[in-house]
UniProtKB/Swiss-Prot annotation:
Alpha-L-arabinofuranosidase involved in xyloglucan degradation by mediating the cleavage of terminal non-reducing alpha-L-arabinofuranoside residues in xyloglucan branches, converting the 'S' units to 'X' units. This is Non-reducing end alpha-L-arabinofuranosidase BoGH43A. CDD domains: GH43_XynB-like. Gut bacteria supply the human body with energy from dietary polysaccharides through glycosidases that are absent in the human genome. Xyloglucans are a ubiquitous family of highly branched plant cell wall polysaccharides present in the vegetables we consume. Enzymes involved in xyloglucan degradation mediate the conversion of otherwise indigestible plant polysaccharides to short-chain fatty acids. The keyword Hydrolase applies. Gene3D superfamilies: 2.60.120.200, Glycosyl hydrolase domain, family 43. Its EC number is 3.2.1.55. It catalyses: Hydrolysis of terminal non-reducing alpha-L-arabinofuranoside residues in alpha-L-arabinosides. The active site is at 34 (proton acceptor), 189 (proton donor). Pfam families: GH43_C2, Glyco_hydro_43.
Amino acid sequence: MRNALFLIFISLCSVCKSSAQGYSNPVIPGFHPDPSVCKAGDDYYLVNSSFQYFPGVPLFHSKDLVHWEQIGNCLTRPSQLDLTNANSGSGIFAPTIRYNDGVFYMITTNVSGKGNFLVHTTDPRSEWSEPVWLEQGGIDPSLYFEDGKCFMVSNPDGYINLCEIDPMTGKQLSSSKRIWNGTGGRYAEGPHIYKKDGWYYLLISEGGTELGHKVTIARSRYIDGPYQGNPANPILTHANESGQSSPIQGTGHADLVEGTDGSWWMVCLAYRIMPGTHHTLGRETYLAPVRWDKDAWPVVNSNGTISLKMDVPTLPQQEMKGRPERIDFKEGKLSPEWIHLQNPEAKNYIFTKDGKLRLIATPVTLSDWKSPTFVALRQEHFDMEASAPVVLQKAGVNDEAGISVFMEFHSHYDLFVRQDKDRKRSVGLRYKLGEITHYAKEVSLPTDGEVELVVKSDINYYYFGYKVNGIYHDLGKMNTRYLSTETAGGFTGVVLGLYITSASKDSKAYADFEYFKYKGKPGENK
């Protein structure tokens, strides 16, 4: 009896501890902006915008809102997602995910295509439907379901507009009505509607997705208004005295969700700055607790700011499967974290019988604003090391393969192996910055054998080198800020990609990669 009571006591202590742990932000590091979250039973699902990358709209699953695992992407077929001519400022903008009567809906905007659309599924781990195109314009659309009706909100004319739609056909069932334009900040966007205790709450973002970003909220007794703003707006921002010295900036574009225990939470985007105000990792996904004050308004993390270390009670925490440091290609398919520029040619990505990823060369380069043979992972840490062995085969003059530190078609650092007219191999480092293309260094390699390319980084520099027979050779370094959003533009973040390109359309070149390694600094995102 005494032992049984002791075990019960230990178990209760364990539960209390797990439900009172703090956590670290960002909860999803790297280029994962514009988060939207929904609850289905005791599971949570989250999506992010993806811009020019395919597949589109990464999809995550969690049990506790802190630990997330990417389980897929919502847009996995060319028929769902046309990214022709898309760049880091176009393609897929902010999505919203909602769950209603056993069906998951994801609504978003392809600003390079036909505009607003939604897809749906009964199993988020499976395929999603073909696009259902919508009539109301604007960006950052969201859905709200009530009493068998489906409402859509977006910002077609700079105001937040509401209409009723049929989510299965896309037909608009009511005229668009302006319901709020925020508190006067520029770019009223990212609207979401919730209902709590008889109030309809309209959450939006204002100020643009830079230093002046903020989250504001209004409410009404009726879904179509009139909406009254919270006297304490903004409810989240770092564009004030409380947040101006934080290493986290650009807080905004948020979504709310009620936990299984009745607690409330907000997911939002923000970015970690380097010295100054530059950021390279992109806008990331952050989590903050929410309480409701005596006047029934939400209060975010007590003072409307967030931090890297959050010492607050949480839901009982459950670890999720993380990305391995060494990624092999023996399964014959890419995990959902891998992305391509625009719509890839499937024939240029082959899995060999001996477990390698084979990339087939085309004349399309990383600077061509098209879809080169390129497959990448998001950089998630300031301090990291990435490497991959590359074997270049049947290469012609100036055919090359390697690793690119890629921000945009006009902004990338490339570490490559190539062959000259005498069939001699070399390894080189090239910088592409706007109109400037600079070959920093190129050195000869042994005639045969594997070359492992290595990219390291800290908050200030990328460091480039290679290994032959296990011996490391340095090639140079380059400042990180030239690949920052503030310098290169766009809405994405740095990705690290394997690529191959040819100097001739008749090239037969290909490159085999046995694995890709990525290791972040221990504790940076913990």
